[in-house]
């Protein structure tokens, strides 16, 4: 079973230490009461992976690990079998000892769009909300972050993260916890908080913005990446049953509307840093994620629209500061 003791020890003497008042009991209850029916199968795959320590590790240009001399083809095949037991892989890519995990999302492209607008991450304590497999946590460590904590209630993603960590030598600078942000106390302890691809899944987006704010230190920075629509500060799309085949999409504001929401929640220095149309090169079906992807979610006769007739996915990055 996954042990969180290393994380508890890591935060015991720092600004996150008040979290220890609630977190151990919370995660113990999770282990007893909330495990997914497939969790043991997934975690068994993690346990059967070799504990490898790379001789070359690149977290600045990607997530790439190599070893000299290289691992054997038999080791690589066994490693691939265990990692394939953790499919689908959505956020990546990863390059591990000659094995490439070609994930559904080119999360490295998103990182290239986001990073130029973010305050330097070196030495920072960071929270990544909805972190998925933890790909961006490793990129944050590559930028010199002191500690990168990801939260995501999806238990497969936790197992994917632990698998990658094991193959990166058991690195303790990044951690994933199987929690949603509503389960966190108001820590006010993170220098930077990322929320990427989460806001449109929230029934109450302003509550989500307040939750993010409550995790930041004073003068801390929020990095918010989400779906938007074109329009002025009064424009918000409220999809019907589905948006791009997703059921749980509630509000898609324009970027100016989102800026106004952030200001209404008390953030300052809010800027719209980037906007980009999601392409079928960035999100697509792969050998590591074999179900439907963006190409199937767009109108086959008009790729500027979803199959439901809404504007096709457009994503914005906004940067804001907690005063």
Swiss-Prot record:
Key words of the record: Transferase, tRNA processing
Protein name: tRNA U34 carboxymethyltransferase
Secretion signal, residue range per the UniProt entry: none
Subunit structure: Homotetramer.
GO molecular function terms noted in the UniProt entry: methyltransferase activity; transferase activity, transferring alkyl or aryl (other than methyl) groups
Binding residues for carboxy-S-adenosyl-L-methionine: 91, 105, 110, 130, 181-182, 196, 200, 315
Reaction catalyzed: carboxy-S-adenosyl-L-methionine + 5-hydroxyuridine(34) in tRNA = 5-carboxymethoxyuridine(34) in tRNA + S-adenosyl-L-homocysteine + H(+)
Family label: Belongs to the class I-like SAM-binding methyltransferase superfamily. CmoB family.
UniProt keyword Translocase present: no
EC id: 2.5.1.-
UniProt source species: Yersinia enterocolitica serotype O:8 / biotype 1B (strain NCTC 13174 / 8081)
Single GO biological process annotation from the record: tRNA wobble uridine modification
Uppermost EC category: transferase
PANTHER family: METHYLTRANSFERASE (PTHR43464), TRNA U34 CARBOXYMETHYLTRANSFERASE (PTHR43464:SF95)
Role this protein plays: Catalyzes carboxymethyl transfer from carboxy-S-adenosyl-L-methionine (Cx-SAM) to 5-hydroxyuridine (ho5U) to form 5-carboxymethoxyuridine (cmo5U) at position 34 in tRNAs.
